[in-house]
């Protein structure tokens, strides 16, 4: 058997989203005499090639094989970590499958571009088409309320360029991807939310209540207002003097409880923190970025008597809401900074997550997040680049 190792990557490889290594090697032309087919020699040669690449200082191995070669496809699928996609060469019309593998447990991972799952239609009757008009997303419905950009929520998982769900990526890579706590449930959910109409007045439970009653994480969240129409506002915490008994009576009688809640006008760049237990609602005409715990537990207190296509009211969760509401919570606010120099500005740091704004006037280098992971969102005018 024979093969060639090289530290030079074919230009065709640049079209793919690779996942491992900042110093990759390429294995070319793995060949063997026909008499040795079926003897496991090719598998041994591939393992030997990995060892040689590691000995020469490379941290990952990449290779390709013709999609019509079923024998080599089976070998690479069995012994390489992942399939990165397909390429073609100018002098050859055939398609080639590309594979890669890290060469040690310390091999760094490259950024993984994720594609969202959507909540739309009757799931988000308040949704609109702003995700398409502002961010050119291929939304599935004119009432699309949420693009779940990084999500491990069952049946609403985001996927990589290669079609791998976030859950599959975590199962395959563990701590290499998520850092400490890789064996635990993925803790965060990142989404873009577009509200054509007001969302329901709602509250989310903390971890203890959610675990006991829903068998899920609680929900603490933060918003960054990306696009607000003139006069847009949110409901943000209960007014002073409101009592739990008074709120209970209003809810049981079907009274509109908006007058009991603080209303805040919003502008592009406003940042709002909502701890679990704080009553809130997003108003009409708002497009926002949301970072939250990975939970879909929402208790609706009031939904404006909104009905679906069948004429049915959406269910309210009065008992659960009253169990978890903390009338004294008023959140925290911040503003996105004006871009001056190149710096990473902290907007919020709470036990569940941190929220930073990368101010870039030219170029900004982000250090590795040792022991954890980062979710990076380029909202406008930024190019993310990395070695490897």
What is each PLM-predicted segment?
Residues 2-29, 33-37:
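Conserved acyl-donor/pantetheine-binding loop and adjacent beta-alpha core of acyl/acetyltransferases
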Residues 299-373:
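C-terminal amphipathic alpha-helical segment
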Residues 53-65:
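Conserved GNAT acetyl-CoA-binding A-motif
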Residues 104-242, 303-330, 355:
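Transition-metal
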Residues 10, 64-65, 77-96:
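Conserved catalytic-core motifs of GNAT/GCN5-like acyltransferases
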Residues 201-204, 266-284, 293, 388:
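Conserved metal-binding segment of the jelly-roll/cupin
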Residues 32, 38-51, 55, 74, ...:
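Conserved acetyl-CoA-binding loop-helix of GNAT-fold acetyltransferases
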Residues 231-267, 368-388:
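A short beta-strand-loop-beta hairpin characteristic of the jelly-roll/cupin
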């Amino acid at each position: 058997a024979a093969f060639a190792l090289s530290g030079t990557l074919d230009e065709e490889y640049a079209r793919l989203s690779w996942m491992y290594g900042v110093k990759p090697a390429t294995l070319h032309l793995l060949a063997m005499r026909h008499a040795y087919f079926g003897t496991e020699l090719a598998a041994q040669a591939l393992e030997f090639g990995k060892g040689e690449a590691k000995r020469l200082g490379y941290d990952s191995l990449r290779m390709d094989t013709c999609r019509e070669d079923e024998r080599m496809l089976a070998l690479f699928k069995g012994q390489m970590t992942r399939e990165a996609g397909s390429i073609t060469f100018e002098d050859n019309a055939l398609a080639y499958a590309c594979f890669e593998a890290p060469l040690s447990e310390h091999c760094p991972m490259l950024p993984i571009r994720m594609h969202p799952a959507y909540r739309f239609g009757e799931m988000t009757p308040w949704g609109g088409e702003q995700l398409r008009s502002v961010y050119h997303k291929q939304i599935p419905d004119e009432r699309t309320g949420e693009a779940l950009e990084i999500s491990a929520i069952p049946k609403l998982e985001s996927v990589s360029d290669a079609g791998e769900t976030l859950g599959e990526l975590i199962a395959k890579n563990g701590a290499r991807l998520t850092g400490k706590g890789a064996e635990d449930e993925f803790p965060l959910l990142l989404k873009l939310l577009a509200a054509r109409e007001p969302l329901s007045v709602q509250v989310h439970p903390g971890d203890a209540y959610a675990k006991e009653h829903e068998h899920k994480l609680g929900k603490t969240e933060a918003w960054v207002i990306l696009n607000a129409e003139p006069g847009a506002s949110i409901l943000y915490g209960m007014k002073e003097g409101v009592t739990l008994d008074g709120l209970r009576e209003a809810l049981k009688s079907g009274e509109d409880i908006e007058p009991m809640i603080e209303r805040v006008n919003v502008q592009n760049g406003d940042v709002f923190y909502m701890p679990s237990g704080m009553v809130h609602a997003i108003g009409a005409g708002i497009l926002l970025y949301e970072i939250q715990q990975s939970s879909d537990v929402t208790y609706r207190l009031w939904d404006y008597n909104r009905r679906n296509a069948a004429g049915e009211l959406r269910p309210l969760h009065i008992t659960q809401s009253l169990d978890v509401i903390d009338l004294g919570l008023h959140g925290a606010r911040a503003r996105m900074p004006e871009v001056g120099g190149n710096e990473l500005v902290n907007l919020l740091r709470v036990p569940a997550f941190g929220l930073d704004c990368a101010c870039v006037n030219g170029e900004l280098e982000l250090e590795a997040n040792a022991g954890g992971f980062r979710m990076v969102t380029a909202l406008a005018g930024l190019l993310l680049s990395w070695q490897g």
